[in-house]
């Protein structure tokens, strides 16, 4: 499953859990680092696509930018916890990095975990 997982985990965690009980599942989270922090660009007008409402956001505020980063970190932690609880493996790909190397690293690490798990089962 490939997603940015920005929606509330309540909307996708249960279907992911059901999928993971029947299949080997890898949740691939695509992250744009520009969404993890808020740049100081002055007064920013944002529009809610659902309601059409607009809001002015004073991005010069250090306090606001710090709260934004904190909320983004909390959202990422909640996403990781929900994916783990659903029984899926979690691969994070960032748009500012070489995603191919991240995939290779993930496959090597995953293969080692599976091998270790199987070796542990054989020792019983």
Regions found by a protein language model. Name each.
Residues 1-4:
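Acidic beta-strand-to-loop metal/phosphate-binding motif
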Residues 7-124:
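Von Willebrand factor type A / integrin I
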């Amino acid at each position: 499953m490939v997603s940015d997982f920005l929606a509330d985990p309540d909307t996708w965690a249960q279907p992911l859990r059901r999928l993971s009980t029947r299949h080997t599942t890898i949740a691939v989270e695509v992250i744009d680092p520009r969404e993890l922090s808020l740049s100081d660009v002055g007064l920013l007008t944002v529009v809610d696509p659902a309601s059409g409402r607009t809001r002015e956001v004073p991005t010069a505020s250090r306090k606001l930018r710090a709260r934004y980063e904190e909320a983004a970190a909390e959202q990422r932690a909640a996403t990781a916890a929900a994916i783990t609880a659903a029984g899926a493996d979690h691969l994070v790909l960032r748009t500012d990095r070489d995603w191919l190397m991240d995939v290779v690293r993930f496959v090597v690490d995953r293969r080692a975990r599976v091998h270790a798990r199987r070796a542990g089962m054989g020792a019983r």
